[in-house]
């Protein structure tokens, strides 16, 4: 059934829709299946995403038609389809009237992903008007809160050197806590790897007090504050809160140095919102494990990593992993810096839409996945700044000397970039950074050819 007379209006302009402030706009790359006309398939997509179905129903009235989603732009050659969703379509909380990400996803990326007349459709950008922005929670804490605890300026406080406890699984409580202590002697921030939780060989009630003891020892010995991001991901929100509450009690007077990590893609938006609302005084660390199933460029359905990052800020994530932009082991390229810019800036023009954030706090880009000191100078140069958290697991625990030396090499890499220095020359006067060349020789050969002749290996 051709529904384009009702669910498409190509006379609408994007500028008018944005000026009106009453619609969320979504841009997709959409291709219909063979034998289906583009506008007809697009209109069916909009119908399925809002008030319609595959036939006319007798219960539809004029009010219903007033909240139809409308296709307002198509370009078949570039597979560009854009839809305007009235704000009133989206579900609101009974308790406080605020918007919810679950409803946004249900409408804009729900049943339309399995429609029989659509070959593929992937959301590449979306726009939220001011009224919508103000109805989402947004972050309660941001990187400035971490800088403050670390004794740094709250503006442009710089690079936070972090790690992931490695190996990913298999450490018992005492070795786990020892690994944390050894890194904290040189670094700032430690996160659980995403599978680490309450395994039978490492129960949280034993691990967390030992980790806190390691933190206190490291703070006493270095005179620096330290930060720990604990994984509270669980199927049950009550279990999440039980883990969080236990950790807060264990950390006691240093509870402000405790962040909560939530696997937001596998756990869903309800898990992020639970953590954001139940623990507004903690830094909310959004891990995105599994996202590549839909965000990968090889997938033509779902949504992009840029869309995921943008959603995370609306939900209230203090920080989210944004990949390594081609400088680490994760899929991506240099242009992925847009994922960082949309979450950290007050406004940004993405692939399709310009987004203003109207005072919503920023979300920190978290860089992780195959990074080490040798890869960081190029990464910072591409991004244009170092106001990020970097969690380098192998980059710290794979350092030839120690995890503490690995942490120092990461800090020295940031200082190298900030000074505009040549990394090989910088290594001559920065021992831990120099030893990173020997720790990761394949990277050194690729990134800094001739380093072996220019840099005498340390004894």
UniProtKB/Swiss-Prot annotation:
Q: Please give the catalytic activity noted in the UniProt record.
A: 2 (2R)-3-phosphoglycerate + 2 H(+) = D-ribulose 1,5-bisphosphate + CO2 + H2O; D-ribulose 1,5-bisphosphate + O2 = 2-phosphoglycolate + (2R)-3-phosphoglycerate + 2 H(+)
Q: Known InterPro entries for this protein?
A: RuBisCO (IPR033966), RuBisCo_large_chain_AS (IPR020878), RuBisCO_lsu_C (IPR000685), RuBisCO_lsu_C_sf (IPR036376), RuBisCO_lsu_fd_N (IPR017443), RuBisCO_lsu_N_sf (IPR036422), RuBisCO_lsuII (IPR020871)
By its UniProt entry, which SUPFAM superfamilies does this protein fall under? RuBisCo, C-terminal domain (SSF51649), RuBisCO, large subunit, small (N-terminal) domain (SSF54966)
Q: What are this entry's molecular-function GO terms?
A: magnesium ion binding; monooxygenase activity; ribulose-bisphosphate carboxylase activity
Enzyme Commission code(s) on record: 4.1.1.39
Family matches, as PROSITE patterns? RUBISCO_LARGE (PS00157)
User: For this protein, what does the record note about how its cofactor is bound?
Assistant: Binds 1 Mg(2+) ion per subunit.
**Cofactor(s) named in the record:** Mg(2+)
- Top enzyme category: lyase
Residue numbers annotated as active site: 166, 287
Stored HAMAP family? RuBisCO_L_type2
Identify this protein by name: Ribulose bisphosphate carboxylase
Q: Which organism is it from?
A: Dechloromonas aromatica (strain RCB)
């Amino acid at each position: 059934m051709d529904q384009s007379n009702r669910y498409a209006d190509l006379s609408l302009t994007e500028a008018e829709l944005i000026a009106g402030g009453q619609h969320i706009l979504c841009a997709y790359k959409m291709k219909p299946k063979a034998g289906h006309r583009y506008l007809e398939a697009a209109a069916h997509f909009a119908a399925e995403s809002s008030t319609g179905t595959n036939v006319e129903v007798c219960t539809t009235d004029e009010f219903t038609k007033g909240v139809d989603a409308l296709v307002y732009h198509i370009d078949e050659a570039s597979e560009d389809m854009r839809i305007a969703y009235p704000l009133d379509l989206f579900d609101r909380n009974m308790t406080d009237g605020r918007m919810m990400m679950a409803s946004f996803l249900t409408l804009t990326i729900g049943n339309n992903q399995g429609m029989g007349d659509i070959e593929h459709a992937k959301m590449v950008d979306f726009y939220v008007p001011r009224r919508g922005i103000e109805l989402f929670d947004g972050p309660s804490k941001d990187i400035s809160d971490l800088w403050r605890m670390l004794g740094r300026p709250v503006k442009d406080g710089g690079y936070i050197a972090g790690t992931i406890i490695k190996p990913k699984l298999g450490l018992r409580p005492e070795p786990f806590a020892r690994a944390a202590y050894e890194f904290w002697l040189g670094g700032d921030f430690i996160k659980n790897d995403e599978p680490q939780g309450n395994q039978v060989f490492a129960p949280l009630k034993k691990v967390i007090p030992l980790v806190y003891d390691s933190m206190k020892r490291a703070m006493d010995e270095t005179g620096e504050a330290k930060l720990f991001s604990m994984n509270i991901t669980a199927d049950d929100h009550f279990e999440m809160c039980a883990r969080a509450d236990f950790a807060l009690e264990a950390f006691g007077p240093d509870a402000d140095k405790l962040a909560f990590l939530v696997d937001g893609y596998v756990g869903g938006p309800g898990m992020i919102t639970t953590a954001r609302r139940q623990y507004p005084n903690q830094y909310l660390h959004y891990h995105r494990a599994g996202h590549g199933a839909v965000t990968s460029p090889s997938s033509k359905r779902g949504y992009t990593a840029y869309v995921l990052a943008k959603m995370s800020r609306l939900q209230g994530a203090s920080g989210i992993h944004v990949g390594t932009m081609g400088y680490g082991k994760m899929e991506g390229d240099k242009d992925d810096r847009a994922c960082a810019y949309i979450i950290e800036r007050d406004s940004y023009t993405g692939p399709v839409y310009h987004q203003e954030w109207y005072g919503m706090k920023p979300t920190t880009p978290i860089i992780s996945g195959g990074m080490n000191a040798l890869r960081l100078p190029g990464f910072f140069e591409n991004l244009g700044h170092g106001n990020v958290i970097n969690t380098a697991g192998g980059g710290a625990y794979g350092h030839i000397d120690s995890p503490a030396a690995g942490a120092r090499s990461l800090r020295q890499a940031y200082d190298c970039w900030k000074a505009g220095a040549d990394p090989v020359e910088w290594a001559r006067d920065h021992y831990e950074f120099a030893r990173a060349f020997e720790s990761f020789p394949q990277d050194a050969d690729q990134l800094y050819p001739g380093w072996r002749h220019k840099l005498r290996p340390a004894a």
